[in-house]
UniProtKB/Swiss-Prot annotation:
Protein family (similarity comment): Belongs to the fibulin family.
Disulfide bonds: C33-C59, C34-C66, C47-C67, C76-C107, C89-C108, C110-C134, C111-C141, C124-C142, C181-C191, C187-C200, C202-C215, C221-C234, C228-C243, C249-C261, C267-C280, C274-C289, C295-C307, C313-C326, C320-C335, C342-C355, C361-C374, C368-C383, C385-C398, C404-C416, C412-C425, C427-C440, C446-C455, C451-C464, C466-C480, C486-C499, C495-C508, C510-C524, C530-C543, C537-C552, C557-C578
Lineage top rank: taxon: Eukaryota
GO CC, any one term: extracellular region
Location of the EGF-like domain: 177-216, 217-262, 263-308, 309-356, 357-399, 400-441, 442-481, 482-525, 526-579
Cross-referenced InterPro entries: Anaphylatoxin/fibulin, cEGF, EGF-like_Ca-bd_dom, EGF-like_dom, EGF-type_Asp/Asn_hydroxyl_site, EGF_Ca-bd_CS, Fibulin-1, Fibulin_C
Residues glycosylated per entry: N96, N536, N540
Species of provenance: Gallus gallus
Protein's name in the database: Fibulin-1
Domain Anaphylatoxin-like: start-end pairs: 33-74, 75-109, 110-142
């Protein structure tokens, strides 16, 4: 029984089946299903697209298994024929599935072993542990070599002559006559006889299904048992997997069979474009054309293969020493000494190789007066006023310029202060000077932690705020005070049971017994003592979980009724059903219209707000096989409806008649009542049979 969450009611889905079963169509026989699978295998040589002829699970399994078994016979016959003709198996290149290649080579190898045993004069009865099917092929090929007959393991294998053996010979010669795995046995892949029974197993890459007979492919890509590396994608195949490279290899590389990138040797494959006078040299991902002709020292080969002179004088590393000039020659160069003469304002450098400017401004005797600045130029100099000064033609001196007065509002973003020869900018409170010395940028006051908790910087100021569960003090605007969430108008809805305020937050608690705090730390979650086995019910009692506790009830079937198997578990609620079971010749029991008597338990909360009827139980029944317009189902509450707190209405849902039990009045828990519900099947005004449901209703004192 599903528990209510919040203010939503619990809805019980109780399925009561009518005694008269619906008519079913006749299923196909197992032989017909198998014949269809064999026919498909002979015609298409594949079973993956096998069309199923019936919705029956048994028929589908039979059809698929017979198709696979027939394919295995085809593959095995092909392997035996290949071994008989070629005397080897490795040269066969199968283009079909891995499964075909597996059965082909298995029977081919086993046949070669039998032929070898016949040639060596050994017994045709295999004493190796090679498996049942391999043993049959081994013996057939060995006997074939002795008798000169063709080998066949299938009734319809093409171009094979059958070896007919009488029943007496079969009983004398075939040691596998009473083998449980004879003919492949019931197993889909591998079968091992244990004497009194058999054991099925699967090939590598497959796993045995729960039925112990069939095998299914293991998806190594999902189970993580593949060996694909980084940059590769695992692709599942039948019985195995393969690794596929995620990205292409790029120009100059090719993808190998093992999904690796291999360099393409363009020189070896002849895909290069080197001219006849060049030699192709392979490089990783490309190639290089190297000329056949080698040039002498002082020359270099051009794109056409011609040798041209190298101008050493244009090299970044000057080949000649200081004071000498480089002169290029054919295949070499020469160095020639320089003897310059300097004009006014220049002089020779220390090496005497070239003329350099004389810096008059760097001499101890300043050529310019006080307040001026000397500016050197090539071969001369000039005197100018320093930055921040202007030349006064009257006094012939440089005087300070008041930039703040001359360019008001254009130099500084906030405040301008004049200084001799310059000025500086300042900012108002809440700002600081930028790196350009003129602009003002916001000062992040939060870096000095002025607030007790959190600080938000704003343009030119800052704002204090508090973490969740606190509020800013109205006194100083800096300190944070705890918020009592439990005292807020919505505090009664924060926790489902009880709210306890703590600094900066709150805690929810639940009743001391029967409940635990839910993962959201707000709602209370019922503890199912029956599932946890923390109840104290005796062996003869049944534990029923209710909200906040449990009840031990001893529910027995009345006379002429028996329990229908084990107790039915429906969504955390036990339902006990008693079915009528009459003694022989008990006419009164047979005529009693009551067919089933059920007991179930439902737990409800005390609804905080009850504004409309709450649907709590659904009684569903399948209408009997007679026409619906000749039968009617009447639902009724016959006992336990205290204060008319419940009613039952009839509804039609999905072709079924449903009785909906509703709570129509508010009930304050704790409260316990037993509703006796009747579901009467009426035909022609007469009750044909009746089902009784006893619903034990427990109302919790809490709303959750």
């Amino acid at each position: 029984m599903d528990k209510l969450r919040g203010a939503r009611p619990l809805r019980l889905l109780l399925l009561l089946l009518a005694l008269l079963p619906a008519l079913r169509g006749q299923d196909l026989s197992m032989e017909e299903c198998c014949d269809k699978g064999v026919e498909w295998a002979n015609k298409n040589r594949i079973c993956t697209s096998l069309p199923l002829i019936s919705e029956s699970r048994e028929c589908s399994m039979t059809q698929v298994q017979c198709c696979r078994s027939k394919l295995e016979e085809h593959y095995c016959s092909d392997g035996i024929e290949f071994a008989s003709v070629h005397e080897e198996c490795d040269s066969h290149n199968g283009e079909n599935s891995t499964c075909e290649a597996e059965y082909f080579k298995k029977c081919c190898y086993c046949c070669l072993l039998g032929k070898t045993a016949q040639v060596q004069g050994q017994s045709c009865e295999p004493n190796l542990k090679i498996g049942y099917q391999c043993g049959i092929v081994f013996r057939a090929c060995c006997v074939k070599g002795q008798e000169g007959t063709d080998v066949s393991i299938s009734d319809d294998a093409p171009k094979k002559e059958q070896v007919e053996i009488s029943k007496e010979e079969l009983d004398q010669e075939d040691p596998y006559l009473h083998d449980g795995c004879r003919g492949g046995g019931p197993c889909s892949q591998q079968c091992r006889d244990t004497g009194s029974s058999y054991v099925c197993s699967c090939f590598v890459g497959y796993q045995l299904q729960p039925d112990g007979v069939n095998c299914e492919d293991i998806n190594e890509c999902i189970t993580g048992t593949h060996s694909c590396g980084i940059g590769q994608t695992c692709v599942n195949t039948l019985g195995s997997f393969r690794c596929q490279r995620d990205t292409s290899c790029g120009t100059g590389y090719e993808l190998t069979d093992d999904s690796r990138c291999k360099d393409i040797d363009e020189c070896e494959t002849g895909t290069h474009n080197c001219p006849p006078d060049f030699i192709c040299q392979n490089t990783p991902g490309s190639f290089r054309c190297r000329p056949k002709l080698q040039c002498m020292n002082g020359f270099i080969q051009d794109a056409l293969g011609n040798c041209i002179d190298i101008n050493e004088c244009l090299s970044t590393n000057m080949p000649c020493p200081a004071g000498q000039i480089c002169i290029n020659t054919d295949g070499s160069y020469t160095c020639q000494r320089i003897s310059p003469s300097c004009g006014r304002g220049y002089h020779l450098n220390e090496d005497g190789t070239r003329c350099v400017d004389v810096d008059e401004c760097s001499s101890s005797d300043q050529p310019c007066g006080e307040g001026h600045v000397c500016i050197n130029g090539p071969g001369n100099y000039r005197c100018e006023c320093k930055s921040g000064y202007s030349f006064d033609v009257i006094s012939r001196t440089c005087i300070d310029i008041n930039e703040c007065r001359r360019y008001p509002g254009r130099l500084c973003a906030h405040k301008c202060e004049n200084t001799p020869g310059s000025y500086y900018c300042t900012c108002t409170m809440g700002f600081k000077l930028s790196s350009d010395g003129r602009s003002c940028e916001d000062l992040n006051e939060c870096e000095s932690s002025p607030c007790s908790q959190e600080c938000a910087n704003v343009y030119g100021s800052y704002q204090c705020y508090c973490r969740r569960g606190f509020q800013l003090s109205d006194i100083d605007g800096i300190s944070c005070e705890d918020i009592d969430e439990c005292a807020l108008p919505t505090g009664g809805h924060i926790c489902s049971f009880r709210c306890i305020n703590i600094p900066g937050s709150f805690q929810c608690t639940c009743p001391s017994t029967g409940y635990r705090l839910a993962p959201n730390a707000r709602n209370c979650q019922d503890i199912d003592e029956c599932v946890a086995e923390t109840h104290n019910c005796s062996f003869n009692e049944t534990c029923f979980n209710i909200q906040g506790g449990f009840r031990c009830l001893s529910l027995e079937c009345p006379e002429n009724y028996r329990k229908s198997g084990d107790t039915v578990r429906l969504e955390k609620t036990d339902t006990i059903r008693c079915i009528k079971s009459c003694r022989p010749n008990d006419v009164n029991c047979v005529l009693d219209p009551v067919h089933t008597i059920s007991h179930t338990v439902i737990s409800l909360p005390t609804f905080r707000e009850f504004t409309r009827p709450e649907e709590i139980i659904f009684l569903r029944a399948i209408t009997p096989t007679y026409p619906a317009n000749q039968a009617d189902i009447i639902f009724d509450i016959t006992e336990g409806n205290l204060r008319e707190s419940f009613d039952i209405i009839k509804r039609y849902m999905d072709g079924m008649t449903v009785g909906v039990v509703r709570q129509v009045r508010p009930i304050v828990g704790p409260f316990h009542a037993i509703l006796k519900l009747e579901m009467n099947y009426v035909m022609g005004g007469v009750v044909s049979h009746r089902n009784i449901v006893n619903v034990h209703i427990f109302v919790s004192e809490y709303w959750f």
